[in-house]
Every structure is written in C-alpha cells, then in structure tokens.
C-alpha cells in the first residue's frame, strides 16, 4: 500500500471522467487546480468530475486550489516575441499599458524600479534571459539593462529579481475571487503562491473564516529567499507547505535548491505538518512515456527526505502521458518506501532537537516505538481534528495509520498526510464504543483481519480535540472464552472436544488442543500429544493445571461451557498468560 501521497494537476490532458478515473486508480490522491490558467467555469466542471470519480471508485480524493499569486510579468511584445543577443542594451519600463520590443520591455509591477539596484539582475521567463541592471533612469523610471545571454523574450513572461525583497501584496484581487469561488464549491486545500511572510497566510485564513471554512488547509508555496528567511513564522500559521522548486530555482541560486528542500521538509516533519515536493519531478514525461533516471532519483530522494506528497504539474495537466506519469510516480514512491522501512529508528531519533511537551506528540512517538517492537501492522487513531494522526505519521511507522474520524472535511484533509488512511465512522458515545467501532471499521475496510494485533489511540474525555492520552493494544477478532491461564505461553491448533478419556485418546493428534470438562490420569495419552488444553474444571491445583505445568504446555482452566461453546475441529488460539481463547489464528501474543 502506497504511503506517500500524489498530487496530480488537472488540465487539457486530463479533462474527462475516464482519464481522471485512471489517474485516481494509478495512485493520485489529491487533484490540483491551477488558477493561473483557465476560468471558473472550466475549473468547476473538472471539480464536479473529481467528485463523480470519487463516488464511482470509492477512493478518497482531495481538491486543491492553487492561486495565481502576486507575480510580475512582461506585457505583450510587438509581434509576440523577439530575440535579444548577449551584450544588447534594453530598457525595462514600469508602464504596463504598452507593448514591448527589442529596445524596451514593460512589466506589470511599477515597484520593480524601486525594489532593484544597479548591479542587480532581472530574469525573464524562469531565467531563460538574464539582464544586468547597468543604470536607473530616475526621470523615466526605467531600468537600463544589458543582456547576459542570447534568448527569446515573449509576451506575458514571468519576471524575477533574485535576492530582492519585492513588495507585492500577499494575495491579489484575483486570488481573493478565486479563493471565494473555491470555498463555495467545496475545495479541501489552498496552495498559496509566492508566500513571503506569515501575514500572507493569515490574509487567506481570514477569507476561509469569513466563509465558515476554517477546515480548508492552507499550504504556502515557498518560492523566494524572503519566504525561506521567514519560514519559521510562516509554518506557525500554516497547515502544511509546498516546496515549489520552479520559481525558487530562479529566485535563489539553483545549486542551493536541494539543500533548501531538505531543510524545509525536515522543519515540516518535526512539526508534524504535511509537506509537498513539487516542480519538474517527472518533467520529461510530458513528451516521453518513461522518466529519466535523474527524475526517478529526484522523486526517490524527496521520499527519503521525508516528503508527505510528490506532485505532478504539466506531466498530468498538459503532457502526452498523464496516466503513465502518475503510475511511474506511484511505482517510485512504493519502491522507495521499502527503504524507509529499514530506517525507522533514524526517523524516531531525528526529532530530538524539536521535541515538544504536549501529550499527543509524546503518545505519537510511543505508539510508533511500540508498533515497531511488537511488529504491529496497523495503528488506528481516533481523531477529531487530524492532529493525532499527523503526530503519528511524523515518525514514519512501518504500520498503516488508519485515521478514524467523524467529519468528512477532516477525512479529506488527512488525504495528503503520509501513511494515513482516513476512514469516516459514526461518532461513538463513549470510549468502549469507540474501541468497538475502531475494530469494526478497520476490519470492514480490509486494513485488519481476525487475529491481528493493533494499537488504538484515542482521547478521554472522548470526542474533544487535543485530548489524546490513551493507547491500547487490542486483538482483532472473536474472543470465544475466558478462564484462568496456567503458564505464559500461547498456542494455535485444532480444537478437539472430548467428553470422555476414551474419546480424547481416540481423537487427539499431535499438536491438537484438547477441550474437556475435566481431566484425570486416564486422559494422559491424549494430553501428551496435545499442544494445549482448555478445561471447564477450575483451580490451579486441578489435574489439567498441574499436568500442563509439568509438560510445559499452555492451559486455561475454569472456562465455563467450553465443550459446548467451542466447535470441534475449529482453529483456536490459546493465550495462557491472559487466560483467553480466540477464534482463529492470533499472532503477536
């Protein structure tokens, strides 16, 4: 089962129910809607398709709105584009009403003149063309520049000024309209472009609260040096983070991007906040059916770094192979997770310097350690807000984390968290009911089977957010009976119900479990072949108890109506330490 989540961008290449269904079946968990392109009508049509696919497939699918953000672009160019050569002089004007040419281009942000300095650099089209600022014409408010390289400058291309604090607004009027539209139509996540400071996130959160949609999770995209410098304060007010390597690689030296990625991921992991690694992960698959070896390595390293999700942009939105791109990313994620399984101890140690003092986080770490020690494959976390599941996920357990939640909105918000399988359940009224519901739902969804040992995490008083304080080890399945155990061992075998010594001696074979009302010396031929005994007669000095200790086999005595409750020939597990008899095979006792 894949634990790393996949964010898949929708676009012209994935614009029908059949393709979106294939993307979901290939492993996409969250669908990204890029509001830098398209209109509300187009996006709503795709959102409706995602919800239809969710109902059709039964898979939990999230919807993420990616804002256009406050960005600087060139205006249109005369003739659409032109070529500039190394050493050419060109001016950059702040007049956004005019078209550009090889002598002068115009940009959409008038403050660029004030924010930049002589000797600085202006990059066009993700760095395809670099301009060095030679002088500033104060009278005309134009930057006098020299081309660093030969290249093409086109219409409406992105403009960056590396290392410069740009005083653009956190969210634009378009962003506000787009976010309100998304909130109205049930989005689950907002990916906020060009976030530079905490206030940018708070402005978006205010829009969510205004729409009574505080459940929508906000993931700022860190794309500039200013955002990197302010990362700690940004994370404090955010629900997660996107490492957006595209503009980041233009705004800061590209050689620093891998190390910034690792730092940002580690900070998110330590706080238990999900992080997405994005941009050009399988970029060549826009045109080719297979990724390059470098791309495979890039995705794998992001997973090893600790990313919660890996993202596809143009690969699934505009490329020739959208489904194959998701499938390739799925396969890389799953293969890499096998390596993570062997590194769990490192995951448990890596947050020593970040340890908090709250109970939920302490229990999260304890749960993962316990699961690792006992070989538990499923952790069931009852969570009202999703916090408990995230605090367990941060330690990257080998076990699957089943998040039992009672709100569909919280369920969808957990769909992007590493290793978490969010399941909607009816809200129980007390802790005992919760344990029963947790076992039932996990079994119903195929996460566990009878006999599995699971860890259930919850809070008392039940149902209140932030009260996680309870961890319980529980065996899934039917406990048939209870008695007094003799010894400390456990055994699995076929039940042989015998009402007399003669019947027992005739029916019991090597390794069977003898079930009888009582025993005496006449039962010894059968007892010597048995791997365990269940007896209705009680007492630690009874024949069965004494013989069991002598032979070193598990025995449970004082089991009322054992010969009538237990079916002859059925498979049983006898746990002498607990004095319990279970239907079927139970491991990890």
UniProtKB/Swiss-Prot annotation:
Keywords: Allosteric enzyme, ATP-binding, Glycolysis, Kinase, Magnesium, Metal-binding, Nucleotide-binding, Potassium, Pyruvate, Transferase. It comes from the Bacteria. Strongly activated by glucose-6-phosphate, ribose-5-phosphate and fructose-6-phosphate. Weak activator AMP and weak inhibitor fructose-1,6-bisphosphate can act as strong inhibitors in the presence of strong activators. Its EC number is 2.7.1.40. K(+) binds at residues 34, 36, 66-67. It is an enzyme of class 2 (transferase). GO terms for molecular function: ATP binding; kinase activity; magnesium ion binding; potassium ion binding; pyruvate kinase activity. Pathway: Carbohydrate degradation; glycolysis; pyruvate from D-glyceraldehyde 3-phosphate: step 5/5. Gene3D superfamilies: Phosphoenolpyruvate-binding domains, Phosphohistidine domain, PK beta-barrel domain-like, Pyruvate kinase, C-terminal domain. The record marks 221 as: Transition state stabilizer. Homotetramer. NCBIfam families: PRK05826.1, PRK06354.1, pyruv_kin. Belongs to the pyruvate kinase family. This is Pyruvate kinase. It comes from Lactobacillus delbrueckii subsp. bulgaricus.
